[in-house]
Amino acid sequence: MSKERPKRNIIQKEYDDSDGIPWSEERVVRKVLYLSLKEFKNAQKRQHGDGISGSLKAVNGLLTNGQSKGLESEQLENEKDDASQVSSTSNDISSSDFEEGPSRKRPRLQAQRKFAQSQPNSPSTTPIKIVEPLLPPPATQISDLSKRKPKTEDFLTFLCLRGSPALPSNMVYFGSSQDDEDEEEEEEETEDTKTATNNASSSCQSTPRKGKTHKQVPNGQVFNGSSKSLKEKEPAQKHKSKEATPGKEKNSEHKAESRKDQAAANHHPTTNTGSSTKGLTANNHHTLHRSAQDLRKQVSKVNGITRMSSPSANAASAKKMRDVRPSPSKTVKYTATVTKGTVTYTKAKKELVKETKLNHHKPSSPVNHTISGKLESSNAKTRKQVLSLGASKSNNTAVNGVKVNGKLNQKTCTKEVGRQLREGLRNSKRRLEETNHIDKIQSPTKRMKGAVNLAEAASKKAVVEKPLLNGHLKKEVPEKNLERNRPKRATAGKSTPGKQAHGKTENASCENRSTSQAESLHKPQDSMGKHEKGSSKSGWGMLGEIPILRPSTKEFHDPLIYIESVRAQVEKYGMCRVIPPPDWRPECKLNDEMRFVTQIQHIHKLGRRWGPNVQRLACIKKHLKSQGITMDELPLIGGCELDLACFVQLINEMGGMQQVTDLKKWNKLADMLRIPKTAQDRLAKLQEAYCQYLLSYDSLSPEEHKKLEKEVLLEKEILEKRKGPLEGHSENAYKFHSLPRFEPKNGLINGVVHKNGFRNKLKEVDVPLKTGRRRLFAQEKETTKDDEEEEEEGVLSDLHKCIYKGRSVSLTTFYRTARNIMNMCFTKEPTVAEVEQEYWRLVEQKDSHVAVHCGKVDTNTHGSGFPVGKSEPFSRHGWNLTVLPNNTGSILRHLGAVPGVTIPWLNIGMVFSTSCWSRDQNHLPYIDYLHTGADCIWYCIPAAEENKLDDVVHTLLQANGTPGLEMLESNVMISPEILCKEGIRVHRTVQQSGQFVVCFPGSFVSKVCCGYSVSETVHFATTQWTSMGFKTAKEMKRRRIAKPFSMEKLLYQIATAEAKKENGPTLSTISSLLGELRDTELRQRRQLYEAGLHSSARYGSHDSSSTAMDGKKKPRKWLQLETSERRCQICQHLCYLSMVVQENENVVFCLECALRHVEKQKSCRGLKMMYRYDEEQIISLVNQICGKVSGKNGSIENCISKPTPKRGPRKRATVDVPSSRLSSSSSSKSASS
């Protein structure tokens, strides 16, 4: 038995041509092919017998209006004779007879007729071939026709491989016009005067031809091609056939006449497009003749040959198209058919039956809307634009640039254009006419995604081919520019988030474009801004471009040397963009599983906090609170926050929850809310969110809604009267203003954790725990009061917040969320201009809830995007941002590793992720490199505009008593258009993958991401910055803002290190700053001693006097802490030179705040001063620096003589300050005294 088993398992058809096809299917295919061939031969014989007379008349000449009545009667007889033969096909799917058994089986058999009859003249990717009626001409032409028949297996191969790279090159244009002479012969053959064929096929071709224009009869009735009214229409159809049958017109006069007629038809007020009925009627005899000529002359150029098709060519085409239409159960929902050079799109059978039945029962309804496959927009639709598309259509007539919300978009899709060029679709007047009229009509099913994509493909084809339409020349969009503007998210799904666009990074960085090319990338957008703003175009017109630098390979070595060489030219702009040489190709290596805490930004609240959407949400929250329901955070679906305010509005417009459930419209509602279809259980989560948060609110009466709205508005007014504008409100923790904007701390934003309202209130993470503080501090009392007030404010307590703490996610999860939010905001890949336009619309109108995520990640924890291995290329390059902090030209190298300053950090964003208007708190310059992902839009205001900007923002935000710049730094986005109109210089640039952006000290900068992107940033500083940095440090201390590093430490570290090297320029810059610092430090020490603070100790040493007085106490651990970790309790100043500590409470004061505390408390009990350098060491260091700077001038005496008078009284007043050099006994005596 073992020997027989292999024989049983042998597959008999292993080497057969049809391997992989089940035997049952193969048998059916063979049977159907046989029947199809047989039926084809019979049909050919019948056509030869019935239509020979009409065929000869059509070939030999033109039929005019003056033909005899005898010909008219002869044509009528032909119609009647042939009616029985084509009755099955004339009753198209628009007729109710389609549901009968024979009609249902018929398409299946006739669909296979393609295999025996298909011709190599139709586009390669369309499943419906052009099948023009093959009327038998003389016998010599029959042999020519037979040579053009392809093999059945070739056609099957084409069907399986169409649109894919595997399609053989000889089949790429399978079905398109290749042999021009044969093509013309075929057209002559198909110019038939059989009016019966025209009549019978009128309904067939009208159903799928969605874009065909038509005229209305005076009574408003339009022929729908149904078999029921066929006999009633025969006189009119007969009359139409007689005039529509003239053959080719080959002279230029006829062409010019037809062009004029078509131009007139385009502007005819009664020209409309029907959704399913395309029959032509005429108001008068002359108009009918002209329109018939226009419809007949479809001119398109294929391989340089102008061809013209006759109307009768559509008869069999429509017939075959109806036969081969795929089953509704298949995945193919739309099929494309080329008839007379016009692309028409048809839906599956069931949908067509529904539409045609609807139109059949309502023939008197005005046909003023288009099909679902002809939606006019060629741009990415946003949620708002999709919902309000109908209102914005009426004023938009451009094909290549469609206005949406009053702004002009000029996006074209290169991918779709390229595909259509590859298919070889023929252009025609009718198609261009339909495209021109597209903006005047509405689609009944315009939100269907497939239809939108097909319509976009058709509209973009019309843009590229540049024909004359109505005397206007269509704009041709260069493919090169389209490639350059193409977004970078398309390939994201094919690779990991960390590496998904690295190939694009290399391509972008490798292109050594000229200056004019780079500028052309943005100047069109700027000019677009002028048009898209309408009345305010003067604001966008003044928006300047940031300089673009292209260093050579030799110049691109040391970033600080290169930046210093161009500083004079570019610093006045506040920022510049650097495009590296082509050989700069560092590979971005990120761990896809690295985790970080995100930041959630509410884009609609980045401008003014209060808007329509925020008001509705406040009403919902207030009602829920009255019901005892707490909504700490909005529900999430697919990682995206659900817009509850829009949700409740849409569900009411659809008739309420009950009707939505009964009619099963939850799916449609989810699509309208733009919830990602890939989100798990999106309908269940949507229903759960409604029941949990909106059901109670939705059941309120209109009077209760108005009452609730009045209460919310009253509460808002009271809040603003007490605290000022919402934008100026700050949380309690901002009194601790922990760290600068760009500093990540363990993956947290700004080193802080949010923790109030939806999420947690701000809490400083790098300040040591203050668990033992007493209420004797006024700040603690103020904090407690503010906490109580916030609880009383209720739902409006967090209105001033627009940024919240998110979750800890992996890079892969973040990427998926970014993809979902992109799909919520746009229906397809947007351009930079479209993202920018939609972003400012959301910020200014505030009518939609849009929440996006971003993250700032410390590279010291999760790794840099740059190569860091010693053997890796570019790991030691100067522009590698992990190498830059150690550059000898940067004075920040003396600080060591400081998170957010000398340690680079990653900026991970998605579409609309924003870095609001701000400047570094220390006014430090920095460099940003875009590793991978979508482009980023940067706006910059130079430092010279600071005072003017302060006044403008103060006026715009109505900041009563609050400096404008302080409000601007509270996450407020003001449009560059508004700032430009106020006279402030604003510059803009678009950073692409693989490019650097350099920001100069003091510049105000904001950034908007156009999609998922990863960039890396690090600070640097030269000696020219020290004066500005010292001034900024004093201002931050006054405003009680925490600094990431101590300016005192930096100056002393520079002085110690550079004094050994005798670096004259650097020492001369810091000498005056060191002198000022010395005077301030010694004066404050003397004042504290005079106030009664006599206990002191040096850092790192234990005061023996304290242990002698209290033997039970052990040395405090905080005595051994570095001063960089100790901040003043009051002003958040980093205490480097000295500080005052309260031993019992473990609280730190700077000398200035300690003096105020002693004066207020009238006691120094429990306080001790800690210092790093004693008085003599400070003076000695300053004198050494001044001596090296002065050199042989002898001016060092001035540096030494200043502190001398202060030194004498200090020593006489206290003998225990230099306690490290005194004995323990003397220290204890001085302490006891």
UniProtKB/Swiss-Prot annotation:
A motif (Nuclear localization signal) lies at residues 102-108. Transmembrane segments: none annotated. Residues 873-1037 form the JmjC domain. The keyword GTP-binding does not apply. It is found in: Nucleus. A motif (GSGFP motif) lies at residues 863-867. GO terms for cellular component: chromatin; ESC/E(Z) complex; histone methyltransferase complex; nucleus. Residues 139-168 are annotated as: Sufficient for interaction with the PRC2 complex. It holds the Pfam family ARID. Residues 1-10 have a biased composition (Basic residues). Keywords: Chromatin regulator, Developmental protein, Differentiation, Nucleus, Repressor, Transcription, Transcription regulation. Gene3D superfamilies: ARID DNA-binding domain, Cupin. One of its GO terms (molecular function) is chromatin binding. The ARID domain is required to target the PRC2 complex to its target genes. Belongs to the JARID2 family. Regulator of histone methyltransferase complexes that plays an essential role in embryonic development, including heart and liver development, neural tube fusion process and hematopoiesis. Acts as an accessory subunit for the core PRC2 (Polycomb repressive complex 2) complex, which mediates histone H3K27 (H3K27me3) trimethylation on chromatin. Binds DNA and mediates the recruitment of the PRC2 complex to target genes in embryonic stem cells, thereby playing a key role in stem cell differentiation and normal embryonic development. Associates with the PRC2 complex. This is Protein Jumonji. It comes from Gallus gallus (Chicken).
